[in-house]
């Protein structure tokens, strides 16, 4: 075995991201966003492991539901982890408030955690199974005087037929049985927006196994019109509580899920023009719905689109377009254009192509007037089995590159991970697959002692 720098060493995950901006799997890859326009996503850990639904599979360790939900613990840990992210990764990133079920937090504690994330320059997204009521959402975003304490929220709601215990759908047999619950979730936000002006972003998550792969296409057709701005699919992996493993999840990979997604959309969904991290892990297609038809941001086979992409990443890659005040963003864009005035013509040419893909200017204007234009992103995240992550991660901690091809591929994917968790107590940034496959087991065992379900005395 040869020597290899472990990516948990200070600065190494960031270096891996920057390297991916130049190369991908051994060759130049101009489509790579990591290290050029994004540092990657961030997530919390050990902040509220408990969940009140039962999923098959579940990425949590067996001890997760034996840990008490404690708001003070959550807010303190979120604050420490986000501060460390800011120190190591810079002033801005997207971060997930994730653990067990976020709505088990009291609304005040949930809001406090989101506000702490924003204090550290993070754009937070709450990860939920969606089985909470409008009253909870109202208490989360509205302050004691009736105003909004949270002007904008982002939620990723997980719905699939592998989940057990949802009110009204305790043991769903098909994905179609969950469509009313998917619609109800969006409707809660629409109604509160109409009343308070709340802004929101909603994503739809779905685990895919051999049991429901054949229902992905129909689910896409049903969910796309509902009002979500993203549909994300996660092929199941053998990770977490092994008592909940029911199938051979290796039968379902990123290609199979993407093909089912395209069947549901009704045409090809091109993803090759923009890549986020390792293509074995992530596949993402950004676009918009125009009168219900999905239109991609880029055509990866059109040289004019690719030229616009390259200009954008070369000149605007360091500009944060979300989370920046409009006036400040305008100043930043104008500053870039002052140094690269030719970018304006390239951008106009790209916009012309995008409008043409959407059916022409008249159609786009008409759809905008009808309110039927909105962003829509499709993605698949393919996680890895704990049986591979465990030994691969252990070798990486010793600075050793695996000789076994499967373990070496696992090491490559861990080193290129776009989804990171912070350990300020040890000075490490850890890939999510390593967190859930290796570190969660001991972490939740310790939390079970720190936050037992029953408090005596």
Question: For the regions a protein language model found, what residue spans apply to each?
Answer:
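Radical SAM/AdoMet-radical enzyme domain recognition
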Residues: 82-83, 87, 91-97, 106-234
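N-terminal [4Fe-4S]-dependent radical SAM core
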Residues: 1-44, 88
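Canonical Radical SAM [4Fe-4S] cluster-binding loop centered on the CxxxCxxC motif
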Residues: 32-76, 89
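Conserved, mostly hydrophobic/aromatic
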Residues: 51, 97, 427
């Amino acid at each position: 075995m040869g020597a290899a720098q472990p990516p948990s060493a200070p600065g190494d995950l960031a270096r891996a991201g920057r390297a991916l901006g130049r190369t991908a799997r051994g060759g130049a890859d101009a489509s790579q966003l990591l290290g050029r326009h994004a540092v990657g996503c961030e997530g919390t850990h050990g902040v509220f492991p408990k969940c009140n639904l039962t999923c098959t599979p579940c990425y949590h360790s067996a001890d997760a539901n034996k840990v008490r939900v404690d708001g003070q613990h959550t807010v303190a840990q979120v604050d420490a982890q986000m501060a460390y992210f800011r120190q190591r990764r810079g002033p801005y990133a997207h971060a997930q408030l994730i653990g067990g079920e976020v709505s088990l937090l009291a609304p005040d504690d949930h809001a406090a955690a989101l506000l702490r994330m924003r204090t550290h320059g993070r754009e937070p997204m709450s990860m939920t199974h969606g089985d909470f009521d409008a009253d909870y959402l109202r208490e989360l975003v509205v302050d004691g005087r009736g105003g909004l304490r949270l002007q904008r929220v982002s939620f990723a709601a997980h719905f699939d037929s592998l989940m057990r215990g949802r009110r009204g759908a305790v043991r769903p047999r098909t994905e179609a049985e969950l469509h009313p619950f998917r619609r109800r979730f969006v409707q809660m936000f629409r109604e509160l927006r109409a009343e308070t002006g709340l802004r929101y972003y909603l994503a739809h998550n779905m685990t895919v196994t051999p049991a429901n792969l054949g229902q992905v296409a129909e689910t896409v057709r049903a969910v796309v019109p509902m009002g979500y701005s993203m549909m994300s699919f996660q092929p199941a992996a053998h990770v977490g509580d092994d008592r909940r493993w029911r199938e051979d999840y290796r039968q379902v990979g990123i290609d199979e899920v993407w093909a089912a997604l395209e069947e549901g959309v009704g045409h090809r969904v091109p993803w090759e023009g923009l890549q986020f991290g390792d293509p074995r892990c992530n596949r993402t297609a950004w676009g918009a719905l125009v009168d219900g038809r999905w239109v991609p941001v880029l055509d990866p086979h059109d040289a004019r689109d690719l030229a616009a992409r390259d200009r954008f990443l070369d000149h605007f890659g360091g500009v944060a377009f979300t989370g920046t005040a409009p006036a400040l963003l305008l100043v930043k864009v104008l500053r870039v254009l002052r140094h690269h005035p030719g970018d304006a013509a390239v951008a106009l040419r790209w916009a012309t192509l995008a409008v043409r893909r959407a059916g022409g200017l008249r159609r786009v204007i008409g759809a905008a007037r009808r309110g039927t234009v909105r962003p829509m992103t499709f993605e698949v995240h393919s996680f890895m089995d704990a049986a591979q992550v465990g030994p691969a991660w252990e070798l990486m901690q010793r600075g050793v590159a695996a000789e076994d091809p499967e373990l070496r591929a696992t090491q490559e994917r861990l080193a290129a991970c776009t989804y990171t968790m912070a350990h300020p107590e040890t000075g490490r940034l850890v890939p999510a697959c390593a967190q859930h496959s290796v570190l969660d087991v001991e972490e939740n065992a310790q939390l079970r002692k720190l936050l037992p379900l029953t408090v005596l005395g």
